[in-house]
Structure formats: C-alpha cells, structure tokens
Swiss-Prot record:
Pathway: Porphyrin-containing compound metabolism; protoporphyrin-IX biosynthesis; protoporphyrinogen-IX from coproporphyrinogen-III (O2 route): step 1/1. GO terms for molecular function: coproporphyrinogen oxidase activity; metal ion binding; protein homodimerization activity. The active site is at H107 (proton donor). This is Oxygen-dependent coproporphyrinogen-III oxidase. Substrate binds at S93, N109, V110, R111, G259, G260, R261. GO terms for biological process: protoporphyrinogen IX biosynthetic process. The lineage of its organism: Bacteria, Pseudomonadati, Pseudomonadota, Gammaproteobacteria, Pseudomonadales. It comes from Pseudomonas putida (strain ATCC 700007 / DSM 6899 / JCM 31910 / BCRC 17059 / LMG 24140 / F1). The keyword Repeat does not apply. Homodimer. SUPFAM superfamilies: Coproporphyrinogen III oxidase. It comes from the Bacteria.
Amino acid sequence: MTSRTEAVKAYLLDLQDRICSALETEDGGARFVEDAWVREAGGGGRTRVIGDGKVIEKGGVNFSHVFGAGLPPSASAHRPELAGRGFEALGVSLVIHPYNPHVPTSHANVRFFIAEKEGEEAVWWFGGGFDLTPYYGNEEDCVHWHRVAEQACAPFGADVYPRYKAWCDRYFHLKHRGEPRGIGGLFFDDLNEWDFDTCFAFIRAIGDAYINAYLPIVQRRKDTPYTPQQREFQEYRRGRYVEFNLVYDRGTLFGLQSGGRTESILMSLPPQVRWGYDWKAAPGSEEARLTEYFLQDRDWLGQ
C-alpha cells in the first residue's frame, strides 16, 4: 500500500468504529456483530450488522478494501481509458433501516479508488455522500439534514453543496418510477479536482458529518406512535429502495461485478418489504403528501 492508501484506510476503519459506537448507543439494545472476510481475488473487509434492536430493525456498516488486475465494467464504463488497469478500492458504506415509519432510512458512503498501470501515473479519485429516505416527511428533519450537508461542504467552496446536492437528486432517481428515492443530500464521484490532501479532507468532512445529520432526527422521531397501516406504508415504500439498489446503484453493481462478497453487498436491503399492484395513496393523506411535497426537487435551505 502507498502512504496515501494507508492514510485513507486508517481513517475509514476509525470512521466505521465511531459510527457503530454512536448507533449502538442510540439504539440502546442491539449490538453490531462483526464478520471479517477475505476476498479470494484480493483484499477483504469488516462487515458489521445490527438488527432487532429497540430502534434499528436492520442495519449495516461495512468496510472493504479490495484490489484486482482489472476494473469491472461499472467502474470504467464512463472512463474507458481506465479499462484493464489494476485497481484498489477502499470504502465505508452503511444503511440503517429503523422500525418506526416516522424515522427515515439513511445511507452514507465514502470511498477511494486507485487505478494503476505499469509505466503510467496512477489515477485516483474519491466518491461518496449521504442521503435520507423518509416514509412520513417532516420539514424540520429535511432542513436539518441539508443544513449539516451544507456546513460540511462550506469550507471547500460555496458552490460545492449546490453541485453535490443536485448530483444527489439526479443520481437517486428511479427512472422507471419517475420519482426520487428520498429527499437527497450529497452525492459525488470521480473527485480529484483538488490536490489529494484537500480531497481527503473533504471526504473526512462528509464522513464525519453523517452522525451529526442523522442522530438528531432519530432522537426526535423514534418514540412517535404509529399504526399498523403506517407500518405497511413504510414496507411499501421500502420496495422503492430495493428497486433502486438492485437496478441502478453503482456501488452494488461494482461489488457484484468485481466478485465482491454478496452478503455484504446486499446488506443494504430492508428486512420487510411489500409490493402492491398499482397501489395509490388516498388524496390528501400523509402518504400522498410524501410524493407530492417531500419527494420533489426542492431547495430545503431556501437559497
């Protein structure tokens, strides 16, 4: 490993530890179970899963560091000049699915890629972000989530949050449904526009911001009473989450195409999901308001 890779790996392992500790404390019941694994083609990781807690129905916080002789198609499709290069990929990826329909699902990811070829300069880039998927929308939560995202981006330029917020809105979009997966946040990829140290500092700012963005929302909503019908709606909306991850998500596709660990890759899927044929929310209901108001391309900070 190069010194850069070592520095990124040390940060990601520490980030995984800190996020798991914070989520365990907030749940107050369940503990993460670690499954360390080795990839035959090169590398390995630490999968940590939690479930059946007081707050978290299912969740996972994964670290992986894999390498190989050639980039898989999902990683080189938009950069064909990198096809055939050897690669290293490091990242932390997490998804948290709470029981309570009033607590949104959250997702975060930070990652680092290096593509190398003998006799040529190594090409590196970072990617990541975090996004929120509510089932019953709350404006206070949406504003808080985006405010933390904006504050994390602010030291790196006034244009960074608007650019990566818009990218998130475009990326987490179910084309076949014509709707977004959630209320967005930040998404970026192929980040090497600054020098390495600045890009690495930005990744740390985003990774460190996740807990500050998510835990206050969990704390506000976890004790909100809910009905069996609201739970059913949560499971119905979770179906959209499954559809996106299996059809569009670049991280899922990269993992499967690169021979990654299937159990860890599919850890993001919720435990209870339902699909109903041509289901429609009642006009004027909270369920209808989710798509009509919250799942829209909206400037939550009023900028």
